Regions:
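Proteolytic maturation boundary segments
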Residues: 1-42, 46-48, 108-112, 119, ...
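A structural supersecondary motif
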Residues: 7, 34-77, 136
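Acidic/histidine-enriched alpha-helical segments
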Residues: 52-56, 96-134, 157, 181-192
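Short, flexible segments with low predicted structural confidence
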Residues: 61-62, 132, 140-145
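M16/insulysin-pitrilysin zinc metalloprotease superfamily fold
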Residues: 64-123, 145-146, 159-163
């Protein structure tokens, strides 16, 4: 797998501020920015012939192993022979955010998603595994920050989310995407037949893409119902209770078998899989 990275290095929030409400605000905005960028990358994946298989964005408080710098990072798993086009796409999407920011509706969706994650963590606070606490304490010891507990964090995040406008989010992300102090990384297998671009070619592609004109992000919103015409309802033709592990098996009129297994592992969660 060939993975392409662009690191936009930036100064970190000082530790004495990172352990205050300022650190929580910063983390909230970073999660919002990453969520919206990931949504935009997902839109590209649904277009014809995307150059990458997967792409994401995130802010790394530690650039690589450096403790003194953070980095707004965009990364993608490039398709074979599509390294240059992947780099071009990542740069153009980043420049789109740099120039125009995010839309209010994008922010609202991301805000709901982020708060939902914290709500889920809050609801599952009594089912938390030990390793989650260990990771949090280790991160606090090595990187600083805050560990107020999910009860306090959930309460504060709800207050913060109500008072952070999209303009503040846009100002943050546009400050993070600098014009210099940028690192391009490329990793892949040392395999016969695979050709990688030189450092000069990567730089040339990056600079060229950064000069390309980009338009504001345009959302395509459909008012059409998800299912325009509801199908004729089927029926449950057979119900088997007392199955292994407390499951119930329903046989439907179309021949599909549905296995229902209630658990108390998590609250407010339904998992569905099909084969």
């Amino acid at each position: 797998n060939t993975i392409l990275y662009i690191f936009y290095k930036h100064d970190k929030l000082p530790n004495d501020l990172n352990r205050t409400i300022a650190g929580l605000v910063k983390d909230y905005i970073q999660q919002i920015c990453a969520s919206i960028m990931d949504e935009r990358f997902d839109d590209i994946l649904h277009q014809a012939n995307p150059p990458f298989i997967y792409a994401e964005a995130y802010d790394d408080d530690n650039f690589m192993i450096a403790k003194s710098k953070g980095a707004w990072t965009v990364a993608a798993l490039a398709k074979e022979g599509e390294i240059d086009s992947t780099l071009t796409t990542l740069v153009k999407e980043t420049q789109r955010v740099k120039q125009y920011g995010f839309t209010p509706s994008e922010y609202e969706r991301a805000r709901i998603n982020v708060l939902k994650q914290y709500e889920s963590a809050y609801n599952e606070r009594n089912n938390q595994k030990n390793d989650a606490y260990v990771r949090e304490y280790v991160n606090h010891f090595t990187n600083g920050g805050y560990i107020p507990g999910i009860e306090m964090e959930y309460t504060l995040l709800n207050q913060i989310a109500q008072n952070i406008p999209v303009e503040q989010v846009n100002q943050y992300i546009q400050d993070m995407i600098g014009e210099d102090n940028i690192v391009i990384g490329l990793t892949g297998p040392d395999k016969e037949g695979i050709k990688y671009p030189s450092e000069e070619n990567l730089l040339r592609t990056f600079l060229k893409a950064r000069q390309m004109p980009v338009e504001p992000y345009k959302e395509t919103v459909s008012n059409e119902p998800l299912v325009p015409t509801l199908p004729t309802p089927g029926q449950i033709t057979e119900t088997k209770t007392g199955q292994p592990f407390g499951a119930t098996v329903f046989t439907l009129s179309n021949g599909i078998k549905v296995v229902l297994k209630p658990t108390e592992f998590k609250k407010d969660e339904i998992i569905m899989t099909a084969t």
